[in-house]
Amino acid sequence: MPDEINQPRYWDSIYKEPDEPRWVLGQAAPPLTHWLKSAKRQLGRVAVLGCGYGHDALAFAEHGFDAVGYDFAELAITRGQERVVPLHRGGRLKLVRADFFELPATESGRFDYVYEYTSFVAVAPERRQEYAQMCHAILKPGGMLVGCFYNHGRDGGPPFDARREDVLRVFSPLFEIKKLEVSEHSIERRKGHELWAEFVKK
């Protein structure tokens, strides 16, 4: 399985199934919506990793951020461009088919924010340190990683469990941990299992 999930065809095959993938909410993730509305945020450029159809990227754009959503699955990007991008009229939303592990080669230090939601748990566990390094590399000095880590407590994956101690072990060498706590705003099936994160690049 770990080798298979490193290939875009694996993720495209899931999008081709009759039912939508379970990670497609049809709206922005409620913890993100709360964060965007709860206080005035400094605007900037945000990378939305594993963006799917782009609902979270759309939420950022609608709040004035310049949002670039990246996804490995071509079908996810195609559907997002058809269904979600037309909902935004401000010119601040872009969806790109890409392997986010390759972003440091072209996007080093170009983002004020990185947004994480379901990507960390989709990555093979042996690549988690590489994932954290990628997030660090594409952020500007003092840039912030925000989002949720899915601590579901089950064996196997994807999604692979994101235990709090594992998240801290991977990210704390590269980021100052401002917040990592259970979100009070998760959808029903994830209540109590999503850790809201706010990390600042060291």
Predicted regions and their residues:
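Conserved acidic residues
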Residues: D112
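Class I (Rossmann-like) S-adenosyl-L-methionine-dependent methyltransferase catalytic domain
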Residues: P2-V48, Y53-E107, V123-K202
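A conserved beta-strand element that flanks and buttresses the S-adenosyl-L-methionine
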Residues: Y115
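Short catalytic micro-motifs in class I SAM-dependent methyltransferases
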Residues: T118, A122
